[in-house]
Amino acid sequence: FTKDDLFIKRLIGKPWGQDIAALSNMAEGFLNVSQSGERSDKPLLHVSKAVELALHYKVNPYKKDLSKVRTLGYHGYYLEHLNTILGCYALAGGTGYEETHSRVSEHLVKISLEEGNAHARLIPYVKMRWAADQAAIINSLWLYDQAAGGNLHSEPSERWQSYMHQNCKHATGLFQTEVMNCKKYSKQPRGCSMAYLIHYCSSFSPDLAKQQWSLFKEHMHHRSFGFWGFREYLKGYKGGMNPDSGPVLFGLGVAASGLAMKAAASTGDVDVFERLHKSARPLLATAEGLKAVPVINLVSLVATDMLSTSIQFSAITKLAGLQQGGRSISSRKVSHSLV
């Protein structure tokens, strides 16, 4: 991945995780397409490529073939997304990675349950642990169970939900962002984190996802200058932008609003999805047009790089699939176009 693929590489020489996260979102999107009823082998081919790239030594933190890695260690962030990709590949009909899929899944269970707070360590020597990442880990285990017929996700899910309800609820009822309390914002619900958490919870705990989604809309859904989005921080809390949030404009978070499209699709909220999509389309079209303009193109790349477009792709294909299946979705159609 180059700086033309991922905006963050223009700011940080060796960022962690944006490459595997982009591949994970792509894999989810192509799984959505494969389950839409379209008779084509293209989705599986695309997910297969995502697996290949995810295992590549330039993406995986071990810098060598995983079969030659004796212990997977505490690379929870990479492994949560790799396991998601492997789950999507298996559910799309792919074979050949069963041993790796089983190994990664069992390791994620181990490093989750060995912690008193039920949150696996995400990066060696980094204390911070986001609740959304543990939800992603459990979702990846749920995908594994769907493919392999097991029940690995149940205990990590029960332990995590119990811990969050007892220890990590903000006064709004929303879950806090970071559970080790090592950041100023740790006890705050953040938009980018909440949207991801809700999306991942929708698989293994749909009722919890809908409950948090309702609170998320109540406290952080906001309209500014005619555009609908989601706040990165609660009104009144002074927090800045960072690589996770992307730009925060007039209170609205770029990452929070983009990821909220996934959360809306995953919870079947077509009205909010279409509201966000309608607001995003002219902004994305403008950003695409500015990619050729020096200096200004740095801003446009935030919304048009591989991570951003993969998130949009995953959200749009998710909602389109639910509409086709008639699962609590109106008959209104959403375009598959990313812009």
Predicted regions and their residues:
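Acidic/His metal-coordination segments adjacent to aromatic residues that form catalytic metal sites
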Residues: 5-7, 52-68, 114-122, 168-183, ...
